[in-house]
Every structure is written in structure tokens, then in C-alpha cells.
């Protein structure tokens, strides 16, 4: 993989690096998890204007026993990585150090998505256990600055920024460049505010894609394409576990037109304690995606769907 989109974002092409998964699906017609996303708390210390989960309950946090159950269960099913994310701001979770330590002890590679304000809540030992950290630099829209500690050389640091109504276009690159010079992130991902319609999103992708290309490395623009999937299988491969004790099919359901800018109940897949049943060996069914009109995982769903529905011509590549 040579380009930053392929390396540092969720793409269907990464499935090619999991031949054991592909072989298992071909032999059993059952999907098993590769990675999980865990949002342990809804608590946050920012109120970003573009937050796609802004209408959430603001005081929800998973019990640490529930987190351990999730990590144990998906580990037994073969999951290899966990992304700790929001929700809210994950470093505000009361058991964030214990969660990372437990996941590491189970053999997970652990990534952390944070607004960068809570590094002081992470122990030095915990930080050493992280594979990567991605900081949402939109914190600079609301704070004068953040303190990023010296991180282990083996840890991949990345920045992300959402272009939004509060963005000061004449200032943001200057500010980001200052942090890039000091902390040398592997990448700076730029995305648009996805709380919009398809036509506006296409315009944003075109305009911002051209702009960020001019900015050069380490910047890259990640276009988000909205689709309505025929079938949703991605839920089995990379499920999203939320602070309300439910599992959702993915992180993008908050973008759907009926989501009310939160993880709406209509998009719940199952309760946490029902996870084992979803992989129990019974015939799996896709998540009902009739209300998913802003899916950004269409490529992933298409690839997994082709494994679930072989047509007999797979050898003719």
C-alpha cells in the first residue's frame, strides 16, 4: 500500500491482507470479526458544530465489566484490532487505562481516536501499548492549543480535521503546519462535514479534494461517498459497540437522514450480551439497511457480499 487513504483509513482492499478470513468465509459461509470499534463513553469536553452524535445522551458510559465482556467475546471470535473512539471523548472514560491494558493483554492491536485534550489521563505504560493515535485537530477551533506529549517511535501518530462552518480557511493550514512541524505526524487526513445531502457532498469532495492536493504531503483528502447498500454485511466484520450497551452495524449510521444526529434506536443491531449468537454458526443475515441512505462502506459491503454470494466464476479474474 503506497497511498495514505489505503494505509490510514478503512478500505475494502485491506481484506486482501486477511486470506484466513477469505478462506473461512468461502468454506463456511459465515463471517467473523476482524476489527471492532469501541465507544465506551458519551461524555465529551467539546461541543463541535459538526458532531454527528450531538443529540446523544450525554452521561452514558459502559461498565468496565461490559467492556471486558466485549473484548473477551470478540477475541474468542478472532478479532485482531480494536479502535477506541467516540461516542464522546474516550480519554474521559473512567476506565480508559484499564481498557487499553486489558485489550493489549488479550492480544489486540489498539488504536485511539481522541480530541487530544486527555493525554494527561493516560499513563505512560498505556501509551506504550497503542499501535496508533489519531487526533481530531478540530479541537483548535475551540481551544487555543493542545499539549501532545512525546510519543513512542513505534506508535503511528496521525491528525484529522473536518472542514466545517467554523473553519477559518485563512488560518487553519498555518496552525496545522505548526503542529506538523513539531510533532511530525505520519498523515493529516482532511474530510468534509458529512451532515449534508449527496449533491453537496459531491461538490465538497471535488472542491476540497483539489485544495488539499495542493497542500501536499502529509495532507490527504478522504472523499466520503454516500450510497444505499443492497445488503449490509460489514456489521459482522467491523462492528461498532456504543456506550448505550448496544452494537451498531457501523459508525456511519449517524449520517443517515433518519438518525436525528445520534445513534438512533432504529439502527441498533443487537445488545452486547447477544454478540455470541450472531456468530454461533446459524445462517447469518445482513443487517436491514432499508433506512441507510448515507452508507460510506459500500465498497466493503460489496466485497464481503461477493464472498457471501459466490457465482461460480470467481476463478476467471
Language-model segments: residues:
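Sequence-level motif detector for i,i+2 pairs with an aromatic at +2
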Residues: 31-33, 154, 290-292
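Conserved alpha-helical substructure of the radical SAM core
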Residues: 2-125, 129-132, 142-145, 302-308, ...
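Short cysteine clusters
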Residues: 44, 48-51, 232-235, 250, ...
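Generic structural signal for small/hydrophobic residues in well-ordered secondary structure
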Residues: 40, 44-45, 89, 159, ...
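Radical SAM enzyme [4Fe-4S]-AdoMet core and its adjacent flexible, acidic
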Residues: 1, 7-10, 39, 60-65, ...
Amino acid at each position: 500500500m503506497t497511498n495514505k487513504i489505503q494505509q490510514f483509513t478503512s478500505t475494502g482492499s485491506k481484506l486482501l491482507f486477511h486470506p484466513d478470513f477469505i478462506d473461512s468465509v468461502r468454506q463456511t459461509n459465515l463471517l467473523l470479526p476482524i476489527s471492532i470499534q469501541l465507544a465506551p463513553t458519551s461524555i465529551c469536553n467539546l461541543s463541535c458544530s459538526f458532531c454527528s452524535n450531538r443529540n446523544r445522551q450525554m452521561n452514558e458510559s459502559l461498565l468496565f465489566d461490559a467492556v471486558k465482556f466485549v473484548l473477551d467475546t470478540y477475541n474468542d471470535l478472532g478479532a485482531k484490532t480494536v479502535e477506541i473512539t467516540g461516542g464522546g471523548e474516550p480519554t474521559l472514560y473512567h476506565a480508559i487505562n484499564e481498557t487499553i491494558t486489558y485489550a493489549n493483554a488479550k492480544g489486540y492491536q489498539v488504536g485511539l481516536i481522541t480530541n487530544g485534550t486527555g493525554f494527561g489521563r493516560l499513563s505512560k505504560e498505556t501509551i506504550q501499548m497503542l499501535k496508533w493515535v489519531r487526533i481530531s485537530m478540530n479541537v483548535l477551533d475551540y481551544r487555543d492549543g493542545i499539549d501532545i506529549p512525546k510519543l513512542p517511535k513505534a506508535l503511528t501518530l496521525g491528525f484529522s480535521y473536518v472542514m466545517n462552518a467554523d473553519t477559518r480557511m485563512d488560518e487553519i493550514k498555518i496552525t496545522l503546519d505548526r503542529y506538523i512541524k513539531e510533532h511530525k505526524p505520519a498523515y493529516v487526513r482532511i474530510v468534509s462535514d458529512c451532515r449534508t445531502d449527496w449533491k453537496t457532498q459531491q461538490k465538497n469532495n471535488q472542491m476540497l479534494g483539489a485544495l488539499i492536493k495542493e497542500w501536499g504531503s502529509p495532507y490527504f483528502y478522504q472523499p466520503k461517498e454516500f450510497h444505499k447498500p443492497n445488503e449490509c454485511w460489514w456489521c459482522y466484520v467491523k462492528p461498532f459497540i456504543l456506550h448505550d450497551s448496544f452494537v451498531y452495524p457501523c459508525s456511519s449510521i449517524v449520517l443517515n437522514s433518519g438518525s436525528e444526529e445520534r445513534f438512533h434506536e432504529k439502527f441498533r443491531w443487537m445488545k452486547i450480551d447477544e454478540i455470541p449468537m450472531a456468530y454461533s454458526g446459524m445462517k447469518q443475515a445482513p443487517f436491514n439497511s432499508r433506512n441507510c441512505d448515507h452508507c460510506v462502506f459500500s465498497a466493503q459491503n460489496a466485497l464481503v457480499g461477493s464472498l457471501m454470494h459466490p457465482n461460480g466464476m470467481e476463478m476467471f479474474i
